[in-house]
Amino acid sequence: MFNFFKKGLAKTLENIVGVKGENKKITKDLLEEILLEADVSYEIVEEIIYYLPPQNEVKKEDLKRVMGSYFLYEKKETNQEKPFVELILGVNGAGKTTSIAKLAYLYKNQNQKVILGACDTFRAGAIEQLKLWAQKVDVDIVLTAQGYDPSAVAFDTISKAKAKDFDRVIIDTAGRLQNQKNLAHELEKIVRISNKALEGAPHRKILVLDGTQGNAGILQAKAFNELVKLDGVIITKLDGTAKGGALFSIARELELPIFYVGVGEQMTDLQEFNANAYLDTLLDPIFK
């Protein structure tokens, strides 16, 4: 897990080392500079420094304790329902479809039977793209033609999962319609119809966020959270950014857990988020 985050945060760590320079002693002023360079928001940097002990020199264990408090949001358990239904949301280009494929791969490797629902019937090519991923990962998929009612696809997917004893249902959704009102209506309908197919479904509503956007992705996430009450987020493309510190803002501003992080193109490059490993990766070069 440590090496996984090291790969994902390589650019962020490079910036941290650059700001730290030859300094062995980490003062609060230097820490502020380092954290801002890693795209931790100014407000959170000030908060972190405020909650540290009063002395000017910063100790790793104190900093880790304070920073760890941002990742305490409770994750919904995934082993209570069968099939367990997850609704995946996100704008086009955030890595939503590839994240769905990687999630399916992850679950399949945990000996779970997975089925995908191609409910992005709006974007040209979205159904075909998900179909290709389903073939690559070797999982089932329910799909229709472009323009078909996405809530009907969700209903059919969940119904098949119940009938055929699937463990996991992963439902793709449209990232963009002509306007927000249409998207809100569509997502609300998918949630309502999913619950008709299986009481309590969808069990988790997860937003996929592009890690290269840093703090800018928070506004996007808030908009989705208003449309559909989210349960957590997946952060993608962490390996392509020096903004690894934005995870603090995402967790705090949204008051949501980070479920998974993606750090590359390989199927194994999506892993469950581990706050302890993330903090160690971030802090080790500061206190080297």
Protein language model features and the residues they cover:
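Non-catalytic terminal/linker segments enriched in charged/polar, low-complexity residues
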Residues: M1-I88, L103-Y105, N109-A118, K136, ...
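P-loop/Walker A NTP-binding module and the surrounding RecA-like catalytic core of P-loop NTPases
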Residues: K76-K288
